[in-house]
Amino acid sequence: MTIERNNAMSAIQLREGVWSVGVLNPALRVFDIVMESRYGTSYNAYLVTGGEKTALIEAVHKDYFEDLVSNIEEILPVEKLDYLIMNHTEPDHSGGVRALLDRCPNLTVLCSSSAKKFLTSIANEEFPCRVVKDGDTLDLGGKTLRFISAPLLHWPDSIFTWDEADKTLFTCDFLGCHFCEPSMRDTGIHPEYRRYYEAELLNYFNCIFGPFKPAVLDGLDKMPARVELVCTSHGPTLSQSIGYVKDCYRQWAAPAVRPDGKKTVGIIYCSAYGCTRALADAAAKALTADGLQVTTLDVVFAAPETVSALVN
């Protein structure tokens, strides 16, 4: 498969000692096989420097590893990286790990215990690794990072990384969006396109976090109180939109309650010859007679996000 490269992005300084060094993929239209990405995406990574040590957060999709290296080297030689923090190990974040380990022999990886298992399989070798737990810290020299356990947001391995000095929270997929914004800032979204970003924010939530709504509420409660910048793994970083996005997530993750008090049932089916449809219709009729609110969906014609919303 030929990869269309229209991903030019330089390192962007976000705060003192914090840079965005990820890459853009504006041409992407389908993410993870089934999720539509109408406005492309970005594979975000962040460089955090202290007075003594330097950490990279995430390692992007493997097809964009050299672009990541190029962005890092606008700031420092990639071989001088001391730490790689993996908040989550899905291949769009961890694809460059093996190549980075080869390039940086003194690199130490920091991640959760489950992430260590996944990364060992991904890299197919042992590597220097420090497993971190909730509340553990990393001193970069005048800048301390604290790790926050965030399981099922959206994998068992997920953690947040909190930069107290800069009031910056690195959340990986949480609060993100498949929306390719070259400025890497929510303040850079053109006002006329804001509604598209907000629509994609909901689509992203439904497809990725819809199955984990209790974990979403826990994750929101674990966020530090004075966050000024949220650095996600996809889409623009958040500063002016932090409160808005958090409120959206809390609303979308709240248990659904019908005003009339009726319980709801979703029936999802696929029928080649109409037999399964007849069964679905019969089940819907019986459940409705019992006082339940029933919605049926034929997966052949329903959009994935519609099915996901019904299930979740």
Model features per residue range: what roles?
Residues 21, 171, 233, 268-270:
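Short hydrophobic segments within beta-strands
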Residues 63-110:
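Active-site metal-binding motif and surrounding structural segment of the metallo-beta-lactamase
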Residues 242-312:
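N-terminal beta1-alpha1-beta2 submodule of the flavodoxin-like/Rossmannoid cofactor-binding fold
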Residues 12-16, 54, 110-240:
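Metallo-beta-lactamase
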Residues 57-59, 81-89, 109-112, 169-172, ...:
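Active-site neighborhood of phospho(di)ester-bond hydrolases with catalytic His/Asp-centered motifs
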Residues 11-74, 160-163, 167-171, 276:
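Conserved beta-strand hairpin/beta-sheet module of binuclear metal-dependent hydrolase folds
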Residues 90-92, 116, 299-305:
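Short acidic loop-to-helix transition motifs that present clustered carboxylates
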